[in-house]
Amino acid sequence: MTEHPTKITRRGLMLASAGLASLASAFARAATPPATAASPANGPFTLPALPYAENALDPVISSTTMGFHYGKHHKGYVDNLNKAVTGTPLASMSLEEIITSTYGQADKTAIYNNASQDWNHSFYWKSLRADGGGTPPAALKQKIDASFGDMAGLRKEMLAAATSQFGSGWAWLVLDGDKLAVTKTGNADSPLTRGQKPLLTIDVWEHAYYLDYQNRRADYAAAVFDKLANWGFAADNLKA
């Protein structure tokens, strides 16, 4: 049987080109993903979606760090918490209720640690935004000036808390009574157990920065405060 060469018409070529262009456009959209989707739950708690793509905070925090930090570490806390509370009365509680009710109980240390780390990380992701930093909204800025003198005063205290925390932990801007304060917590601990309202946090566990900054925690903390701090989120927490 004799094969005849396919005749390519001008119209066919135009349609094929249009199809390839459409495919390329779809591929380009897929290559720059939007905010991540929440992971399916294997228990009462779900790994929440990131509020941005994993590469959104580059170059301050790399997509490699975000992939490990969010996809491995944070997910691990959620998975471990689900394993620990499924089938118990704690499964029907909120994270905040679990944190405050298990704090200081030796037989529930693992539950407390995983619940608090889940909460802390979810709060940390929201404390960051691409093109962050700068001047906070007016009401928050007024409160900062009253408590720290100015933004430079707040920056000094936040970086001091972040760099002086021995080992793993967190630096926090909190509302303590009617004044703002900076505090730090070790390991999984949270201001929630102290009756303080968290407004913003910087994670100073090594897994938050070591791939990008090695042992230069001070550089990481300064870059987060100056370039990623989500002051709109902090202002919303102040009003809540």
Segments the model singles out, each with a brief description of its role:
Residues 60, 64, 68-75, 228:
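Soluble non-cytosolic domains of exported or imported proteins
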Residues 2-21:
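N-terminal secretory signal peptides and thylakoid transit peptides that target proteins
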Residues 232-240:
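Low-complexity, Gly/Ser/Thr/Pro-rich intrinsically disordered linker/tail segments
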Residues 40-44, 71-78, 82-184:
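All-alpha RGS (Regulator of G-protein Signaling) helical domain and cognate RGS-like helical scaffolds
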Residues 69-75, 119-122, 200-211:
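Hydrophobic/aromatic-rich, well-ordered segments within soluble, folded domains that form packed cores
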Residues 160-215, 223-232:
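An amphipathic alpha-helical core segment
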Residues 27-61:
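C-terminal segment of N-terminal export signals and the immediately downstream linker at the start
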Residues 24, 28, 126-136, 214-217:
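Short helix-capping/linker segments at secondary-structure and domain boundaries
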